[in-house]
Amino acid sequence: MKYIFMVAGKGSRLQPLTFKHPKSMYKLDENTTLLQRMVGLIKKHDPEADIVLVTGHMHRRIEEQVEGVRYIYNPFYEVTNSIASLWFAKEELDADNVILIDGDIVMEDELVANVLCKPVDKPVVLVDSSIKTDGDYNVEVSGDQVLVMSKDLDNYYGEYAGVTLLDRESARLMKTEMESMVEDGYYDQWYENALVQLIFKNDFKLYYIDITNYDWTEVDSVNVLLLAKRIHTQELTEG
C-alpha cells in the first residue's frame, strides 16, 4: 500500500516551537519524533509499505532523521497549501490503495493496525464523532456517506482526523480534480477540498470511518503536544 505524508507546512500555530524544528520532528521521547512514530507503526503493520513524505519547511532536517522512505519536495511551501504538495506527488496516486496522512497526526497502535493499514475498495475519510465543537476541519454526514467537509460548519457530525484512504478509481478522480484546481490557481487550498468538489460536481460518494473509540490527536497546539506524548508513553508502558 502507498502512504503519502504531508509534512511541508511551517506549523505556524505552534510557533515559536517550530522556528527551528518542523512540528513533525517534535520528540515524543528521547529517541522518537512524531513522524518517526507514525512511519514506524505503519512499517510494523504493513512491512511492504511504500511511504512517501512530501516535504517543504526545513526539509533537510526531516530527511536526516526519517529513513526507509521516499521524499518529494514542494519548493513553494511558503505560498501554497497541501493541495500543491500533493500535486508534486501526483504520480504517486497511481496505486491500488493510497493513504493520505497529515504529518501532524499521532495515533495509537491499534488504530494504525485496524484502520490505517487495511486496504479499501472505496474512498474513506477518518472522522471523530466525539468532537462536536471547536473542530478544525469538520464533517457532516448522512447515513454512511460524507455530505460536506469544511472549516465553516456550525453543526457537524465530527472532526476530520487528517487521514484519507483511496482505492485506485477514487485516487484517479482525486488526481484529476486536484490538477484542475491547481491549474485554476487554487494552490492555497487543502487537498481535502478536492474531495468536496468531487462530491458537489460529480455525485462522488465519499464514505467515513468513525474512530471515536481510538486514541489519536492532531498536533496543533502546545496542549495537544502533551496529549500526543501521553498516547506515546502509555503504549510504551503497556508494551
What residue spans do the PLM features occupy?
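Phosphate- and divalent-cation-binding pockets in alpha/beta enzyme and binding domains
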Residues: R13, R61-I62, E110, L173, ...
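Conserved beta-strand segments of alpha/beta enzyme cores
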Residues: S24, D50, R70, K205-Y207
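Conserved beta-loop-beta/alpha segment of the NTase-like Rossmann-fold superfamily
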Residues: I62-D136
